[in-house]
């Protein structure tokens, strides 16, 4: 629910942002793309800065408390955004929202990871993104309707109600790790018996050693050297404070983070350029711009779970390679509507169809980066019991993953905005198609496969 709320509050202002810039702050039309991209990048930049500290704090303090704090900051940021009377305050609101987003996502994903069976990570991540895509899908439409009918005050009122409900529900959640402290002795004995039974079963690493690419277990690879994940040296003070840093000796973890970066790069670009492109091509209102986002986000909802199952079944290599390869022609098509080869009505349909095709590709590439990163980290955790502390490595992992993701979300609006403003949507699409093609090749060659040695 928290991730859903966060995306709603992010997306609800997207169709209204260019109109707020023009109507409230009198930004000239020629500079709207620059300001819109800048504010989206400010949000993502704050998320980048706070992602790793949020992961560290969650690993030390627990995810539930941090999650609640993130939602409170999100409420404050939304209020400042709604009632700001200067561009400086608007920047402050985006900084606060970016900070709270880093906290909510890092702590939220850690809470999910703590309750999920390792062999179901792909479908779980896919299902989560499919579910929250409903918020991503509905938010721009809702924001367009609310802004057109009641102005920014109506947008804030709905956002505040959603946050209040989420905070109330979050107060009822008991963290899994904290719940163990209150279990009765008989429940603890029962849990211990179950643990003994599980201990006799093969671990994730052992199971993967007996499988090959194409079996339904996490991101399959041919990595059978478990000794390479053992820590056999004295660690420095920084690595002791942030144990996950040691895992970056494994090149696969860097590649997993790269996948998250590229995925977010594309998302940030669409978020920043679709509203201005739709207004420029078709002179759409904020409501109509919001409706255009349905074409991009609907495939997330329809295909997210299925794409996650494919990752669990066929591995991260197949999903990442096919997804980014599929995006290449879809991104190249982005410049077609601006040529106005058909009537306006047909051109609108063409624009939405192209966005939908890109949405399909984005749905496919959602899970591989997360699943690959979790797989590598799990190998280190199994090989080094106790190294990551009582709360495990996953909060720190999601902190670093969020760092890469939000870096992409920050770079996307800036790069996409500049390319669109200087050269047009066709050139922008061609540049991003090249990036997607290179990512597909890298995924085919290196993702989900054994690398010869660790770095460092």
From Swiss-Prot:
InterPro entries: MFS, MFS_dom, MFS_trans_sf, MFS_Vesicular_Transporter. Keywords: Membrane, Transmembrane, Transmembrane helix, Transport. The keyword Coiled coil does not apply. GO terms for molecular function: transmembrane transporter activity. It holds the Pfam family MFS_1. It is a multi-pass membrane protein. The keyword Transmembrane applies. One of its GO terms (cellular component) is membrane. It is found in: Membrane. The chain crosses the membrane at residues 1-21, 38-58, 72-92, 125-145, 154-174, 255-275, 284-304, 318-338, 348-368, 398-418, 427-447. Residues 206-225 are annotated as: Disordered. MFS-type transporter; part of the gene cluster that mediates the biosynthesis of pyrrolopyrazines, secondary metabolites showing insecticidal activity. Probably involved in the secretion of peramine and other pyrrolopyrazines. Belongs to the major facilitator superfamily. TCR/Tet family. This is MFS-type transporter ppzB. The gene is ppzB.
């Amino acid at each position: 629910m928290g991730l859903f709320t966060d995306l709603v509050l992010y997306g609800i202002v997207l169709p209204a942002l260019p109109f707020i810039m023009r109507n409230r702050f009198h930004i000239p039309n020629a500079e709207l793309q620059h300001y819109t991209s800048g504010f989206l990048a400010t949000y993502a930049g704050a998320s980048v800065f706070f992602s790793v500290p949020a992961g560290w704090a969650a690993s030390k303090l627990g995810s539930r408390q941090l999650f609640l704090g993130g939602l409170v900051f999100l409420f404050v940021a939304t209020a400042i955004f709604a009632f700001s009377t200067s561009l400086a305050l608007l920047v402050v609101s985006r900084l606060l929202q970016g900070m709270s987003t880093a906290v909510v996502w890092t702590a939220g994903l850690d809470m999910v990871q703590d309750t999920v069976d390792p062999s179901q990570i792909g479908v779980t991540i896919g299902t989560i993104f499919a579910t929250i895509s409903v918020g991503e899908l509905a938010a721009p439409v809702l924001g367009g309707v609310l802004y057109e009918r009641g102005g920014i005050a109506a947008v804030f009122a709905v956002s505040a109600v959603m946050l209040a409900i989420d905070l109330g529900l979050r107060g009822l959640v008991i963290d899994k790790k904290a719940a163990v402290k209150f279990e009765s002795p008989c429940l603890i004995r029962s849990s211990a018996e179950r643990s003994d039974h599980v201990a006799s079963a093969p671990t994730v690493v052992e199971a993967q050693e007996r499988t090959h690419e194409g079996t339904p277990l996490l991101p399959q690879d041919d990595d059978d050297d478990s000794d390479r994940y053992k820590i056999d040296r004295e660690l420095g003070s920084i690595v002791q404070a942030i144990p996950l840093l040691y895992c970056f000796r494994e090149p696969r973890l860097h590649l997993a983070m790269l996948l998250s970066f590229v995925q977010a790069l594309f998302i940030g670009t669409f978020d920043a350029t679709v509203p201005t492109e739709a207004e420029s091509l078709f002179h759409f209102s904020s409501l109509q711009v919001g409706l255009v986002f349905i074409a991009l986000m609907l495939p997330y909802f329809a295909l997210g779970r299925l794409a996650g199952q494919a990752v669990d079944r066929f591995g991260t290599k197949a999903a990442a390679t096919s997804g980014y390869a599929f995006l290449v022609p879809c991104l190249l098509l982005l410049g077609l509507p601006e040529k106005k080869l058909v009537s306006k009505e047909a051109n609108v349909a063409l624009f939405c169809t192209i966005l939908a095709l890109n949405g399909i590709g984005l749905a496919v590439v959602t899970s591989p980066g997360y699943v690959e990163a979790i797989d590598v980290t799990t190998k280190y955790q199994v090989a080094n019991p106790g190294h990551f502390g009582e709360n495990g490595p996953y909060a720190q992992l999601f902190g670093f993953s969020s760092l890469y993701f939000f870096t992409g979300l920050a770079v996307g609006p800036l790069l996409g905005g500049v390319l669109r403003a200087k050269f047009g949507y066709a050139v922008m699409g061609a540049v991003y198609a090249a990036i997607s093609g290179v990512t597909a090749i890298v995924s085919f060659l290196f993702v989900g496969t054994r690398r010869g040695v660790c770095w460092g």
